């Protein structure tokens, strides 16, 4: 059952002109699984007979008793432009959560987890990071993450502090950065890790072409645990 809660913006961090990281304090805080998404509306009411216009965003943090959640929002249309204009520190909005099936495996606590993320598709992966560290099983975690430039490199500190060093693979597509390949993620990058494709859990999050490409490649080698989250 979903929860409707007012939320207050407690911090805003800009990553260039088109991406922002929002920290929200929920009025009503209930447990949600890492990888879930929510609906955010700027139409603030005490109750709704019909849910108003909204946009969905992956929750970029794991559940916390403090009721603080993180969202990563990219300005891509009229409504997200409104969010950028209207949501500042101290502003309120309403969220409806939690939804989705892009979730960590419930019954398998040992097989590797490989996340392939492009751009703001890193959001649910960040929630996985926090949850796996909390569960003490982050050693099974592999992350392939591509981003445009240093400004749009999201939450590197979290990734580096949780994902084992040799299992964190970063790619900068539009800016030459030290020690980071200046290109997109390629299929050869996945293959060279020698995953057991029948046992590893693969999570792909990015735009449609990004997601379809890696899904097709994984299916082609017999991968059986593939989860996608397109945007």
Model features per residue range: what roles?
Residues 2-3, 76-231:
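FNR/FR-type flavoprotein reductase catalytic core
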Residues 2-91, 147-149, 174:
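Ferredoxin-reductase
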